[in-house]
Amino acid sequence: MTEDFEVNLGTGGEDNSSSTMEHRVLDSPPRVVIPEDTESPAKLAPNHGIFMASINKSSPAGKKSGEGAVLGMGAQSTKDNSTPRQNSSMLSTRVIESLHDQVDTLTSTNLQLTVQSKNLLDKLDTAQQKESKMLENSASLKHENENLVSMLNRKTRRLKDVEEELASHKKNHDSLEEEKTALQKKWESSSSEEATLRQQMEMVQAQYDALVDSHQYYKSHYSSQISTLSEQLENLKLEQRNYTQRVSDEANTFNAKLLEFDSKHANLQQAEETRVKYLESKYDSLTQQLDLPSWVQLYRESKNMVLEFAEKMKLKIPSDFETLIQDPELTALEAKNPNSNNAAALPLRVAKQRAGGGNATSTQSGTSGSNAAHGKRSSFYGGMASSYPASTLPGTLPGVRRSSSRRKPSSRVASDNSNSGDSSPIFPHSAVATAPRSSATAPSSRVSSTSTSSSTNHFAFHNNNSNNTYRKRQESTSVGNS
């Protein structure tokens, strides 16, 4: 601890009142407890000399005496330089006087300093006592301060904990406030919904009462209708039983008729199969009698001639003719008979004529008449054709005169011509009934009748009676020609 002390310097009360004393602030000595025996002068002597020297340097009397001494020494030196002998006595006297003055001054000063030092020692004792008390107070205050610091730390930690708890409680409070707000809104909405539901419940209750009343009404109404419908249902059941019995009787009758029809159909199918077999055998025999390669060769020559003529004359071939020559059956027949290019190698079959007989005579006369009538008709190329010799081979080109011989008629070709509705058949049955036909038309009709043999066979199957009659007549005609 630091204390300030004021030291008054002077020789007496007059000096203190008349002159200004110099004040010096001294630092307190270190905190060392001085024992009571420090008041002895022997122990204070070293420090007293140092203290007095500093006082002399700082006091004005000392300064004056020093200055006087210096002046005296200066004057003495000057006197010594001028008159050393005269001034030596005066100088010594003055030095002695000054020394006496200094001794008196120092004595008074010593007394004053002794009194002052005693006062200072008293003050030092009191200050040390105060310091010891203050040290004790400081120690107690320090201990109390430590206790207060520890308590403050505990309170600070407690305060932090309390602040954390306060923050958590604030968060909980905010969340509870939000939850309260949400619950308040939910309660308000639930209250409005409750009011709405009450209104709806009242409406539903009214509707339910109305439905109960209507249910009672409809129950009574429909119970009466159900009783009526049950009576009608009983009547309908009775009618249904009668109708079922009647239908079962009719079904039994129909089954008996159906069995009878099945037996008749089986017999008819068997007869039909027998007739088909007979027709197939007849068709095979007629196919064997028919000279098919010669007809194919004749068709090929006619087709080539027509195409060549149309190319030379620059004529457009009709679409019917193109369709005819592109017929798959005719193309297949041409492919099956690739070796029938020579007409002389495969001549057409002709029926032999008898020398006598009415049929032969009529045939010859009819043939000669037809040849005479068509002897000068137009040829195929537009010119007038002359009479051709009778030695022309059969199967020649169209436009030639036929010989007196006749082919053996085919029942298949005749049936095709009769079914197609042609009034003038290709192979005449007698000389009187034969109509003159152009030789250019006859080969194409024969070929077309041959190409449609399968379709006409089915048609002849359905027209059984007419075919049988025509077949018998054709057979009799062929027998007469032979």
Swiss-Prot record:
Residues 430-469 have a biased composition (Low complexity). Residues 75-90, 360-371, 413-423 have a biased composition (Polar residues). Residues 173-188 have a biased composition (Basic and acidic residues). InterPro entries: She3. The keyword Metal-binding does not apply. One of its GO terms (molecular function) is RNA binding. Pfam families: SHE3. Residues 1-90, 163-190, 353-378, 390-482 are annotated as: Disordered. Its main location: endoplasmic reticulum. Keywords: Coiled coil, Endoplasmic reticulum, Membrane, mRNA transport, RNA-binding, Transport. GO terms for biological process: endoplasmic reticulum inheritance; mRNA transport. GO terms for cellular component: endoplasmic reticulum membrane. It is a peripheral membrane protein. It is found in: Endoplasmic reticulum membrane. Disulfide bonds: none annotated. Residues 127-292 form a coiled coil. RNA-binding protein that binds specific mRNAs including the ASH1 mRNA, coding for a repressor of the HO endonuclease. Part of the mRNA localization machinery that restricts accumulation of certain proteins to the bud and in the daughter cell. Required for the delivery of cortical endoplasmic reticulum into the emerging bud. Belongs to the SHE3 family. This is SWI5-dependent HO expression protein 3. The gene is SHE3.
